Amino acid sequence: MIDLQEMVTKTLVANDNARARSQQTAVGPSAIGGCQRRLWHDIAQTEPTNTGDKLAAILGTYIHTGIEEAIRREDPFGMQYELEIAVEANGVPGHVDCYDKISHTVIDWKTIKKGTGRYFGSNNRQQVWQVHLYGYLLKQNGYIVEDVALVGIPRDGKMSDILVYNQPYDEAIALEALDHLEKTRDMVAQQLKPKPEKPLAFCADFCPYYDPTGEKGCPSIQK
């Protein structure tokens, strides 16, 4: 009898690996504001040492795709919304989920878990830098940007549990993120690795560069 768990797992992983974003090697906005040690390895193009489980990320991709399809159905001619915009500036590529042409708002979809609001929006530097960088990239490519927004969609919640964070676009935030990127690039050039920032429990599950030996990747914070 066919092993259905194995079949589904291999199919999902292969499909995800074939996606353009999965094959992207240049550092994008989503990577800049998180752990600097992971960013260092991204820039250095370190070979992943921890493949981990990709199901949550894969489901997040499908939710993104579903939202995009739903918006296209409601706005088939793109009168209000422009979707999946590929842009680049300062050597940073980005894929913007959604741009509202009427309110000039950059929108980024986030899949979250119910009850994790304390890690969402203003409490999450990585997300804030990311969405303001999207605004910066769009402005550098001729778009008008007035506001940025994050929409958190819980995989395990109800419609009423959807979270929204929005604020006026602030170029200073984007420039702060770009400065952080440049400083980390300089550290890569000098082979100076930042200290680990995350504990073992987090790194083992979520970081592709977790390496208990520390020889190639990152050993996480050691007690």
Protein language model regions, located:
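Metal-dependent nuclease catalytic cores that hydrolyze phosphodiester bonds in DNA/RNA
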Residues: M1-V106, K113-F120, W129
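Metal-dependent nuclease catalytic regions and adjoining charged, substrate-binding loops involved
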Residues: I2-E6, L137-K223
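Long, highly charged amphipathic alpha-helices
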Residues: Y62, G66-E69, L133, E176-K183
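Metal-dependent nuclease catalytic cores in nucleic-acid-processing enzymes
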Residues: T65-R73, S122-V151
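Short, low-complexity, polar/charged sequence segments that are solvent-exposed and flexible
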Residues: D100, R125-W129, Q167-A172
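Residue-level recognition of conserved beta-strand positions in structured domain cores
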Residues: W109-T111, G152
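Short acidic, glycine/proline-rich loop/turn micro-motifs
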Residues: G117-G121, S160-L163
